[in-house]
Amino acid sequence: MTLYTPKQLADSMRVVRKNTIAIAEDIPEAQYDYRPTQGSRSVRETLLHMASMTLFDLHIHEEQKRTSMDGFDFREFFAGLPTNEKNSLPKSVIVAVLRDGGERWCDWVEKLPEAQAAEFVTRGGAGPGDKSRFEMLIGSKEHEIHHRAQLMVIQRLLGIVPHLTRNRQRPQESAKESTT
């Protein structure tokens, strides 16, 4: 029984990434180096970190088709990416990378054969137990949602009302105006 297909995952990730891009666009570039606490990621670092995950998935599951994470050097991989979170890429480039990388990831996941999605990857030193490729890809979507929530809190700290809240408030404001 299939409960959730690669196409459905790609469709839902498109919504997640669209909302991430809206946040990236809403935050002024002058605030991209803001970090809410010492030792936390800045807005720029968080967005680059999120963009890196789609590259990670494509590398692991499409290019290398790894069946085991044993011997994979996570630090080296992420340090070598153009989206390394320590790079000072401008806002326009970050938004473009989020848009293009997200769509590339979604296009690939959408066409992923279910048999390949069901393959298990031994996690080795990356964590206990094996996971299917599909579970790992869902984990990437959850990971982005987690960091997007952090960015929404940062928006509030910067005095920005997140777009999802603004969108929800508009119909309520229109209803109030029509009754007065």
Regions found by a protein language model. Name each.
Residues 13-20, 43-58, 95-105, 109, ...:
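Alpha-helical transition-metal enzyme core signature, strongest for iron centers
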Residues 32-35:
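Surface-exposed patches in mature extracellular/periplasmic domains of secreted proteins
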Residues 1-8, 52-129, 158-180:
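Short, helix-capping/interhelical loops that line the mouth of catalytic, cofactor-
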